[in-house]
């Protein structure tokens, strides 16, 4: 069955992180470029997969990659916070709602994404699994722009502070595995294994 495309909300793939804990052969590695399934990179896998669900997918990053895709470039070169990408996305895309997802969460199901995109009366709707909140797997409304401006001006980069002070709500999902974050090589190897066994998009 073909997924009905979400055409009224763009998806921004957050890929401006540091990969500081991702070590292969004692070298810090950019996890965005690790191969996944039949794709040359995690970046390509996530971008291609999300295009099956969203009409518009844009990659938020500090520099563009070889992958032919639309990019939103974060200007802050030495500061790493997803708030820059979120803020920049609203300023650039000029759209009421944006769905954000980090590059390193390749197992989130389309059902979960659709559930998050289906709730429209909050500033932020984010995913919550049995053990933690996933603030970056979330639907944001442009009404958060003032709070984003203020957070960046005061250099309070804690996402949880901003979200708790906004009119936000969590959607509870019961599958922890789906929200696996590829912070380390071990996480990556686990995701490769899970994708071999199942079919996540």
From Swiss-Prot:
**Record bears the keyword S-adenosyl-L-methionine:** no
Where can this protein be found? Cytoplasm
Listed under catalytic activity are: Mo-molybdopterin + GTP + H(+) = Mo-molybdopterin guanine dinucleotide + diphosphate
Which residues hold GTP? 14-16, 31, 104
Could you tell me the superkingdom of the organism this chain comes from?
Bacteria
Spell out the HAMAP family in the cross-references.
Answer: MobA
* Notes on the domains: The N-terminal domain determines nucleotide recognition and specific binding, while the C-terminal domain determines the specific binding to the target protein.
Q: What does this protein do?
A: Transfers a GMP moiety from GTP to Mo-molybdopterin (Mo-MPT) cofactor (Moco or molybdenum cofactor) to form Mo-molybdopterin guanine dinucleotide (Mo-MGD) cofactor.
Q: How does it assemble?
A: Monomer.
- Protein name stated in the entry: Molybdenum cofactor guanylyltransferase
- Underlying gene: mobA
């Amino acid at each position: 069955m073909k997924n009905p495309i979400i055409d009224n909300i763009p998806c921004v793939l957050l890929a401006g992180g540091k990969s500081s804990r991702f070590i292969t052969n004692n070298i810090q590695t950019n996890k965005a470029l690790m191969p996944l399934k039949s794709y040359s990179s995690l970046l390509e896998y996530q971008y291609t997969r999300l295009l099956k669900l969203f009409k518009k997918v844009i990659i938020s990053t500090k520099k563009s990659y070889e992958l032919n895709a639309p990019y939103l470039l974060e200007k802050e070169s030495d500061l790493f916070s997803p708030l820059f990408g979120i803020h920049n996305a609203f300023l650039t895309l000029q759209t009421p709602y944006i769905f954000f997802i980090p590059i390193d969460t390749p197992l989130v199901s389309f059902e979960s994404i659709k559930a998050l995109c289906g709730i429209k009366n909050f500033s932020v709707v984010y995913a919550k699994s049995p053990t933690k909140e996933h603030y970056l797997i979330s639907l944001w409304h442009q009404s958060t722009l003032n709070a984003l401006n203020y957070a960046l001006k005061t250099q309070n980069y804690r996402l949880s502070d901003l979200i708790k002070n906004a009119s936000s709500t969590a959607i509870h999902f019961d599958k922890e595995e789906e929200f696996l974050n590829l912070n380390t090589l071990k996480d990556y190897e686990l995701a490769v294994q899970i994708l071999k066994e199942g079919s996540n998009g």
